[in-house]
Curated annotation (Swiss-Prot):
EC number assigned by the record: 6.3.3.1
GO MF term list: ATP binding; phosphoribosylamine-glycine ligase activity; phosphoribosylformylglycinamidine cyclo-ligase activity
Gene Ontology cellular component list: cytosol
Alphabetized InterPro entries for the sequence: PurM-like_C_dom (IPR010918), PurM-like_C_sf (IPR036676), PurM-like_N (IPR016188), PurM-like_N_sf (IPR036921), PurM_cligase (IPR004733)
Reactions catalysed, as given in the entry: 2-formamido-N(1)-(5-O-phospho-beta-D-ribosyl)acetamidine + ATP = 5-amino-1-(5-phospho-beta-D-ribosyl)imidazole + ADP + phosphate + H(+)
Protein name: Phosphoribosylformylglycinamidine cyclo-ligase
Keywords: ATP-binding, Cytoplasm, Ligase, Nucleotide-binding, Purine biosynthesis
Lineage: superkingdom: Bacteria
Organism: Streptococcus pyogenes serotype M4 (strain MGAS10750)
SUPFAM superfamilies from the UniProt entry: PurM C-terminal domain-like, PurM N-terminal domain-like
Ligase keyword on record: yes
Record Pfam families: AIRS (PF00586), AIRS_C (PF02769)
HAMAP family: AIRS
Length: 340
């Protein structure tokens, strides 16, 4: 007992940590899927790969966080969607390689354990896992007084998925003449927030900017990142896509070239990009050069598909949403992305 009291005096509340574990169990249970072994609280999460039915399995992993979007979640005291952002950033990366997410682990570090707040965070992680079809099989909550302020926390995630070896998407199948199809983003997603926070530093978050169509600024800024797994998986299974790009930090300019070989380029028709109102607001209030917007943000397209012309109609049939035909693959002359 004296050892626990000594630890508590140093700022670590072990009892609060136990409460967090109990609170999150019901959220973890929502994410159960075939292949999960063991129970929450073991030393390691286990998954039976044979349950996937994949003949030649290749494991694909990804890890990410949500950057300084966390600072807005803390500022506006809204913590129930930031976990979805974390899941999205990881699973969207591995779906771009042709992998189906299998399981997810999260890491939360905080200055002071607040069981209610941390339950909200993990509830968002669980919601993201449900949307991605991934099991939340483990995680870590670290109370680190002195490292973080009492109200501060950081969040990171780790996703593991499986791809059929013959269906791996690595850019090698993308060719000149392929059509670039864009799937809409839900908003800013989880990149560029250091700039976003600077632009709106003097705003309360309750503003109804005319560009935002009646929505409060804080709600638009914290709109959770879209998860593309359920949209993309059927296309991968039917081998309809040659390349996939997750449009994250670096926007169009940095991410689209990751889809294909160095001798190719993407020609983008800017008029066909479904630019969301928040990006118009950022450009206006932040006095950002128009061309720079495409170097920073997703501009309304969160996932890019490179598709052979003969497969475009089938892709559109399978996707129960608007699909934006925004460009094509060309031979590279100079720049890897040409916006016209």
């Amino acid at each position: 007992m004296s050892e626990k009291n000594a630890y508590a005096k140093s700022g670590v509340d072990v009892e609060a940590g136990y409460e967090v574990v109990e609170r999150i169990k019901k959220h973890v249970a929502r994410t159960e899927r075939a292949g999960v072994m063991g129970v929450l609280g073991g030393f390691g999460g286990m998954f039976d790969l044979s349950k996937t039915g994949v003949k030649e399995p290749v494991l694909v992993s990804g890890t990410d966080g949500v950057g300084t979007k966390l600072m807005l979640a803390i500022k506006y005291d809204k913590h129930d969607t930031i976990g979805q952002d974390c899941v999205a950033m990881c699973v969207n990366d591995i779906i771009a390689a042709g992998a189906e997410p299998l399981y997810f682990l999260d890491y939360v570090a905080t200055g002071k354990n607040n069981p209610v707040k941390l339950e909200e965070v993990v509830s968002g992680v669980a919601e993201g896992c449900v949307q991605a079809g991934a099991a939340l099989i483990g995680g870590e909550t670290a109370e680190m007084p002195g490292m973080y302020g009492e109200d501060d926390y950081d969040l990171a995630g780790f996703a593991v998925g499986v791809a059929e070896k013959s269906q791996i998407i690595d850019g090698s199948k993308v060719k000149e003449g392929d059509i670039l199809l864009g799937l809409a983003s839900s908003g800013i997603h989880s990149n560029g927030y250091s700039l976003v926070r600077r632009v709106f530093a003097d705003y309360t978050g309750k503003e109804l900017l005319p560009e935002l169509e009646g929505k409060q600024l804080k709600d638009v800024l914290l709109e959770p990142t879209r998860i593309y797994v359920k949209a993309a998986l059927p296309l991968i299974k039917e081998e309809l896509v040659n390349g996939i790009g997750h449009i994250t930090g670096g926007g169009f300019i940095e991410n689209i070239p990751r889809m294909f070989a160095d001798d190719l380029a993407a020609e983008i028709d800017e008029d066909k990009v479904p630019v969301l109102p928040i990006f118009k607001a950022l450009e206006k209030y932040g006095d950002i050069k128009h061309e720079e917007m495409f170097e920073i943000f997703n501009m309304g397209v969160g996932l890019m598909l490179a598709v052979s012309p003969e497969n475009v109609n089938r892709v559109k049939e399978l996707l129960d949403e608007p699909v934006y035909e925004i460009g094509r693959i060309i031979k590279k002359a100079d720049d890897s992305v040409v916006i016209k």
